[in-house]
Amino acid sequence: MEGLPQMKSTLSISGNTFIALLFSIIVLFPLCANASDKPVVEIAVRKGDTLTGICKKHLTDPHQWREIAHLNRIKNPDFISPSQKLLFPVHLLKGTPIDGTVTFIKGNVTVQEEAGKEWRALLLHNRVKQGSVLRTEEEGTVEITFEDGASFLLKPSTSLKMTTVEKKSSGYFLRELYLRSGKTISNLREATGKGSRFEIQTPSAIAATRGTAFRVSVDDSEATRSEVLNGTIGVEAMNQTVSVNKGEGTFVRKGEPPLEPRKLLPPPAVMNVLPVYKSIPLYFHFEKVADAVSYRVMFAKDSEGKDIIREQAIKPGDSFAIYTAGDGTYFLQARSIDNLGLEGIPAEPAVIRIRMNPMPPLIESPVDNASYTPQSLMFRWLRVNDAVRYHVQIAEDKEFRKIVEAGTDIRDVEYKAAGLDFKTYYFRISSVAKDNYQGDWSDVLRFTIAPPSPVPPDIRK
């Protein structure tokens, strides 16, 4: 492909569930394999089968039957038992290209189906073919899903080529992706019981695992961080390999072996989440986690964290703020970060419900901090479109603990208070929607009922 360097690295995944977060350079291998190992599948021998016949059916090049015979230690290719299960390297099997489907997209995402062709905008439900190059811009995100349920999510500012995406003759799925830059989260589910392999290649390293969920990142100094959420991975650097189990992470500086794995930090719990938030901005605080130097906080529209509205790393004790969000349900999640930059175990997202509508009316009269002599006073406000009625309160204190008058079912845009004493009062109003949801209160208005000034004597008498 034009503009892409030669591929030198591989990320291999096989199993029920896999999640990987990669930057451009990573070094990971399966515990039971070397970097040069090739995945294999088992093919059962049936009565009447011969080795050459099986190879003709399953291999791209049937003449490579000798390699199969050598791998399975078969001396006589004409004599194989129906009870045997033969190992076949996946890369030798026939394959049919399969398309991916765009199942989530946000922002500007483009695709180039072949080298030299024009880039075009990618849309929801588009099919993406083998050999395509995907590119997300600064605010772009896209998810590609395959027929077996496997998927990958490209984060903003990412470039990736779908080098090989095939379904092999044995039912084995092979996916080889080339991650040129950025981040990807991959999810592999084995729904059919058949094997599958998911490889992500980067410019200068190799990563591999089997049946696991993990994150990997590389910073500007090319240091690698690996965090395992489920299963076990092997991390190799400088000819040394460490086993990283569920709930552990390791750190690799460029040119050095991996550090001994350490436990990942638990997530910080969000404090004092309200059932409903009626106004913004929102400020969230988190409980402190021992040994955490910062927290990564994500505010998203979905529980999986694909459609992220805001993401930020904050220091312990700082607040996480949301300045813009409409009515709806959102999901807040945070992870602890230790002194090596390893991100901890994810928490279940907290459900955040925002409902600001109907908004409180704009009060026309009386005027704030004004004095009035009549003991009957008319209150007027502007109509709110999605309000069917209004709730007003008049109190002797600004905390509204001493309410002297209230109206809960006011259909008009005015309210008359009669018989008020000569003192200072406080007024507020809220809108009520058709579903009886009461919105937030208006700002408190202060007014005073004062006795009329005495009539001066008529000096003419």
Question: What residues fall within each predicted segment?
Answer:
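Extracellular low-complexity, O-glycosylation-prone stalks/linkers
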Residues: 294-307, 387-405
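Beta-strand-rich modules
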Residues: 325-340, 419-435
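Extracellular fibronectin type III
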Residues: 340-354, 434-452
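Primarily a LysM-type cell-wall glycan-binding module
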Residues: 35-59
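Extracellular LysM carbohydrate-binding repeats and other cell-envelope/extracellular binding modules
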Residues: 36-37, 57-97
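Short beta-strand segments within Ig-like beta-sandwich modules, predominantly Fibronectin type-III
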Residues: 310-316, 405-411
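Conserved aromatic anchor
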Residues: 282-291, 377-387
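Flexible, surface-exposed loop/linker segments and immediately adjacent secondary-structure boundaries
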Residues: 81-85, 90-280, 456-460
